[in-house]
């Protein structure tokens, strides 16, 4: 994974409020580990900071300031000055209630589907209804003539079949985001979890609706026809512990890094059962996700050739909005083309990295979960910090209606009464 450090090396320590205090504290801790003082621009490796001491420094940071960073960030910001600036950027600041809302849209992925999803909002919001029908029309040619609107309103259990789940979630994400934009809530950045990246790419300006509809529908159809026997296991383990528990299981791998102690594994069901047993013996909570296959894992490889052939016929563009990739864990710095979407099928979801970078680099006041029900909210709250962005879902389940939507728009200072609220 390639991650780009925030800010240029050698930036002045007072460029970011709080960096100077972080720098002084870091130099004190580094002197304790190294047995001698070092300068703010001395590279840690050159000073002799080994991996054990670096892990100790990470522990000191977490104990004093909370989960601001990952252990690997100490390698990415390899001097006290650079690390201090990054810590200052990561530190949540109290919101100024008079400051303008800066919302980032985060699109939910597979696993949040349920019968009648967003049906209440469809019936009571003309804005949402219009955009959902627009997305449904774009998908119909690739779904054998079936409409995702019919699937939603009928409560059809086919919504749990991958060939329909992915297009339905794409349509919902697209419609919810367009409805918010139409009401005046414009995102400063976007990100998506797994298949949620397709709606994020459309809203971010990298893909037209019809091209994204083609890709996501065929992606789901190809995956639907894979042999049964795969699954996904959500765990309360750290990435390191989950990887350790999966050692010796060749068809089990980490498929999502959602937050600290929130790691998902994908693989064959027998292997997942053995891993779950090992984790349970250590008191680590585990639960199986309601999915039919081992998504975001090498077991998806059989899909790749067919999907790549389709994706090559769709010209992917560069996003116009900052797009935080959960493939790389950082802001996209090139086009979201066939190579990107093909890679996305088998790569793990680096959700935690993407959200941390989004928050550090864009300072949103709100993280808005775009999906039929909130499943990412706990991770967003942990990643944003206690005093960081407010986290809110657009939908809380199938009964979400126009009244609930009005509350969301009010929180985002959008909607028909935005001017009066801001006065």
Outline where the language-model segments fall.
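FabD-like malonyl-/acyl-CoA
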Residues: 47, 76-80, 94-247, 285-294, ...
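A generic structural motif
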Residues: 261-267
């Amino acid at each position: 994974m390639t991650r780009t450090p925030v800010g240029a090396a050698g930036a002045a320590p007072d460029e970011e409020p709080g960096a100077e205090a972080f720098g002084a504290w870091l130099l004190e801790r580094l002197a304790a580990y190294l047995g001698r003082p070092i300068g703010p621009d001395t590279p840690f490796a050159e000073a002799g900071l080994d991996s054990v001491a670096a892990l100790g420094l990470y522990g000191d940071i977490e104990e004093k300031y909370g989960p601001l960073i990952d252990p690997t960030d100490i390698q990415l910001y390899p001097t006290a000055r650079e690390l201090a600036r990054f810590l200052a950027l990561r530190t949540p600041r109290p919101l100024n209630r008079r400051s303008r809302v800066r919302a980032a849209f985060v699109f939910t992925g597979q696993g949040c589907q349920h019968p009648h999803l967003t049906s209440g909002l469809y019936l009571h919001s003309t804005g949402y209804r219009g955009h959902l029908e627009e997305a449904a029309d774009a998908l119909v040619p690739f779904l054998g003539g079936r409409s995702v609107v019919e699937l939603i309103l009928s409560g059809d259990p086919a919504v749990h079949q991958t060939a329909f789940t992915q297009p339905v979630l794409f349509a919902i994400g697209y419609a919810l985001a367009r409805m918010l934009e139409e009401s005046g809530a414009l995102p400063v950045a976007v990100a998506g979890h797994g298949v949620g990246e397709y709606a994020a790419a459309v809203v971010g300006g990298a893909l037209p609706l019809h091209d994204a509809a083609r890709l996501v529908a065929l992606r789901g159809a190809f995956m639907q026809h894979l042999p049964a026997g795969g699954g996904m296991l959500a765990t309360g383990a750290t990435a390191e512990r989950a990887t350790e528990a999966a050692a010796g299981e060749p068809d089990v791998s980490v498929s999502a890094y959602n937050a600290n102690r929130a790691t998902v594994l994908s693989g064959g069901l027998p292997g997942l059962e053995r891993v779950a047993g090992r984790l349970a013996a250590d008191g680590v909570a585990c639960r199986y996700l309601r999915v039919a296959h081992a998504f975001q894992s090498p077991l998806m490889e059989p899909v790749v050739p067919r999907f790549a052939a389709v994706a090559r016929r769709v010209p992917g563009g560069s996003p116009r909005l900052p797009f935080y990739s959960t493939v790389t864990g950082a802001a996209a710095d090139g086009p979201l083309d066939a190579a990107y979407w093909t890679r996305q099928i088998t790569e793990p979801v680096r959700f935690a990295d993407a959200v941390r970078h989004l928050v550090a680099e864009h300072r949103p006041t709100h993280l808005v979960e775009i999906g039929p029900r909130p499943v990412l909210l706990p991770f967003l709250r942990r990643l944003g910090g206690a005093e960081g962005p407010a986290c809110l879902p657009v939908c809380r389940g199938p009964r979400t209606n126009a009244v609930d939507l009005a509350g969301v728009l009010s929180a985002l200072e959008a909607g028909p009464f935005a001017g009066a609220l801001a006065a």
